[in-house]
Amino acid sequence: MTRRSAIRNAGKAVAFAGLSLKAPQASAQSVYGKRQVTALALTGDRYHNIDYVRTALGKTLVKDLGISIDFTDELSLLTAPNLKQYKLLIMLRDGMIWPGGYEGPGGRGAVVSDPPINKFDQTPVYWMTVEQGKAVKEFVQNGGGALFYHNVTYISPQNQEFRDVLGAVTREHPPLRPFKVKIVNKEHPITRGVNDFVVTDEQHFVKYEKDPKYILMESVNEDGLTWRDAGTSSVAGWAYDYGKGRVCYLAPGHVITALWNPEYEKIQRNAVKWALREI
């Protein structure tokens, strides 16, 4: 296959999947003609490239489930007027941006440049404004659905409105390593019929701040590896009504292989249907 034909075929595959690769316009309907886009997905940060998120969710939620999603990493699109165009907000990104630049995905290793580059400020800035936190809160309270993944718990320390919607704050995470995800509520529509599963991923530890009855699953390092003073396990998923809307959080999500675990894909698709009140 030539490079040109590969690009052409890839474009056809994206169109078939129903993905919007453009930033959302003034009206979500403009992307698909008269067919309204179901979800806005705000994804991608320094440590989580938007491409892998779009690829992973494009398969699981768009192609396999059939919903339409506007994927974007443009933070300014998280506004109350824009959210009104959607039924569902999906987020997989942390709370920081790095306007001064950074050395690499992990900031590790020596930087070689000839001639030398000027030193730059590698200081993170917390991006979510008070108004954006309120916009998310009002969107869900008024009937919208929210599916939060993985590292959104890093937004909570700097935004109380978002923290209240999400229901948790990060306790950070160890490096990539295998762990088991155990289903603790097998009767909820999101986890019904789903088996425990194992992934190699970042095991995110969180401080969960809502009623324990909403917990769906927990992550456990069965090799006995701990994380700081948090032990070997953490709450890894929950779901609850929030005002007229619904919120679900799912912890795995640092790599495609975790997002595409067959049991986890069931959970993600069920979470979307539950958030949209289809189950």
Residue ranges and their predicted role:
Residues 1-7:
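Twin-arginine (Tat) signal peptide motif
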Residues 27-88, 95:
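Aromatic-Pro/Gly-enriched surface loop or interdomain linker
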Residues 32-37, 62-63, 67, 110, ...:
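Extracellular ligand-binding/catalytic regions of CAZymes and related secreted enzymes
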Residues 34-35, 62, 157-246, 251:
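Catalytic beta-strand/loop cores that center a nucleophilic Ser/Cys/Thr
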Residues 38-42, 83-156, 244:
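Short alpha-beta junction capping motif
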